[in-house]
Amino acid sequence: MLYIEKEGLPNDINSKIIELSKSEKWKSISEDDTTAIRNAFDNDFPKNEAKEILLHEQHGICAYCMRRIRMDNHSRVEHLVPLSKNKDMAIDYNNMLGVCDGGEKVTGNQGHILCCDAHKKETEIMISPLNKVQMNKIAYDSEGKIYTKPKDEDMERDINEVLLLNGIQKKDGTVRDTSTELLKGRKDAYDRARKMMVALNIKGKCTSATVSYTHLRAHETLMN
């Protein structure tokens, strides 16, 4: 996960959202009518325009797992505070993130270990890619596992139990990766970066600039 800095919406899109919020149709929807709120968000909210801006400000990566996402049916608009929990925040752009499909469309024999929004569903979480202090705690080990440093139990609970960013740990201690192979992708990126660092060190070219470049290449590999 990486810190996401909101850029805001253009005036024309903001105007559409304000118009929706002031409409009689929106005002008539009760706070607990999740179906009606969802229908209004899907049909009356400028969702595609908002999604395009989300992907731009997130540099085309999922807000949770950092996989590459594009303007297609493998990406979606996620509500950080679930749509079912707060009517007003259902159309608040500052409550929205661009995320992947979490492996819902993956085919094959791996099985469906969903992640990100696909597994989170309507669960409320305290971890947020919009929180810079939290994102500065995110770290990765050599096996591709995400953890927090210093340790934050609430964040790790959301990472491991709600978003499933580290797959599922089985009773025998082994880990089953997600359908999107998040752990494998991170481990492969780590291994490539380590090999590049070793090679550069042997050549005497292991400078701070090359370290930064190597980290960037590893991150690009992870996103694809």
Regions from the PLM with identified roles:
Residues 210-212:
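Acidic, proline/serine/threonine- and glycine-rich low-complexity intrinsically disordered segments
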Residues 67-121:
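Histidine-centered nuclease catalytic patch
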Residues 214-221:
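Conserved small/polar residues in nucleotide/adenosyl-binding loops
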Residues 4, 101-203:
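Domain-exit/linker segments immediately C-terminal to small folded modules
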Residues 6, 11-61, 86-91:
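Short, charged surface segments at domain edges that flank catalytic/cofactor-binding sites
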Residues 64:
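Short, cysteine/histidine-rich loop/knuckle motifs that typically chelate Zn2+
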